[in-house]
Amino acid sequence: MTMMSDLSLDLVEEILCRVPITSLKAVRSSCKLWNVLSKNRILCKTEARNQFLGFTIMNHRLYSMRFNLHGIGLNENSEEFIDPSIKPIGNLLNQVEISKVFYCEGLLLCVTRNHSSKLVVWNPYLGEIRWIKTRNDYHIGVTYALGYDNNKNHMILRFFSEQGYYEIYDMNSSDSWDCFYGIPNKGLKCYQPGASLNGNAYFLTEGREVMEGYDCLLGFDFTTKKFGPLLSLSFSHDFIETGRLSCVKGEKLAVLYQRCYTYEMEVWVTTKIEPNAVSWSKFLAVEMEPLTSLKFNDDSGSFFIDEEKKIVVVFDIDESERNNTAYIIGDYGCLKEVDLDEVVNPQESVEVGDRIYSFSPFVCSCSYVPSLVKFKEDAEHERKDKKRKSKRKRTNKDGYDFILCFDFTTERFGQILPLPFKHSFRDTWTLSSVKEEKLAVAVLYWKNTCVMIEIWMTIKIDPNVESWSKFLRVDRKPCIDLRFDDRNDSFFIDEEKKVVVFFSSDKVKTSTAYVIGDNRYLRTVDLEKAANSQESVEVGERVYCFSPLVCSCSYYVPSLVKINHNAGRKRKEKKTKRKSKDKQMKLSNKV
């Protein structure tokens, strides 16, 4: 009797390729040989061609989604949208809340929710997960993408479109983010998720100079780590019309475009696509007038196309019933609606300026294709990081988390010195001195409704070395009206009484002193109405205000240093005499 273990690997692979990928867990648990085989070869390829395999976010959790496209017809009476299935992901990802997900050839990049500074890259086929820490927990208005260079080194792009810069994390060679400047056009708006194709990332963008909505395509090359030029779309439209980007079998890009007033829908597919060049052909054009109640949302929908059947499947939310719905549209304008599931907390939305952006719960720009990409172990990165820390300066830039000292004797800067605490971009801190003997730093932490103040003082301070001790820690929740600005305000401390006095200007321009003690004692003293008290300057798009309060020391110390008004003139005279003397010596030498 022939046993499964007697079969050749090629025959076993041929058999297992006919098993649905949803049964992969059962296959791996059945036989050690099959488990090893599945970690080195991609199975289930035959079944994947007949199924749509994707992912969706519901209630901030990741779910797998599967249904069969094999029997879909192009008439209204066909009912072959077979076996739709949505199941929760039962692994470590289910322990965190997820707001956004981005797909790249078998890998998922997940952005965690609630101001977490963690990203997760997940390979569903191998079951591998890689946690990545960002520089800060700022995700509002940030666009992400996952891609790779010519050597298949995977990288993460973190794109701050309106700020004009971007960050890159190389998953193979570093544990840090590199910052770059070089956006093709200042003021680009790019809040939609992009599409990954051949390792590059592409985005629909909106510019300030052209008031026609998503008016161009922007490509990013992970090999050169640069954006390409703005590429034109195959159609023109205004700001109230809908555009959406998708990927076709990892070979082409597709754009879905729906006009606002006529509800005419067009789908265009690329015939050539590179970060620096693009050409288009029309795939589908449908007059949606009989279905005017159907309006796709460019902030919350996604779609994919089937070139063989010439259909487009759009995933969106039925606004009347708040359900996840798949709309199947053919070349003749037929429409089929499939209710996938009831939406629970369907969208993560954020207000940026005067517009509210919603992030799609659907991650279905193309059908999932398994990947054999393996992540380097975190322990390996930690070992490398420890070696680098002994050879390099501190480069963590999560806010102002270091001190830089200038030595006027050597006329040089010292080393970058770390502060004794970590904080996020929402926290504020400011520097002071104590009787010109020590440094003090005050940090104000913002965590939900809990606000806390800490005061640290130096035990030792030199241009190249420092050490700290905690002087005061106060829960500031009972006095929530107190706010201080790290750019405008100042403070000093009294070591004997163990109090700290903050000087600040409130919203009505009143200079106020806040006296805070170790037992949460608080007293406010109105100093005076600060008329025209602040000197401000505009740098780029931001206005910086300089504090009128100069109280970084506990008291003024008199000085006998005299200001030499003639020092500059005397140096100039000496320099002139020296040049004249040198000139005379040269003339005498010639004679």
Curated annotation (Swiss-Prot):
This is Putative F-box protein At1g32140. Residues 567-581 have a biased composition (Basic residues). It comes from the Eukaryota. InterPro entries: A_thaliana_F-box, F-box-assoc_dom_typ1, F-box-assoc_interact_dom, F-box-like_dom_sf, F-box_dom. Residues 2-49 form the F-box domain. PANTHER family: F-BOX DOMAIN-CONTAINING PROTEIN, OS09G0372900 PROTEIN-RELATED. Residues 567-591 are annotated as: Disordered. It comes from Arabidopsis thaliana (Mouse-ear cress).
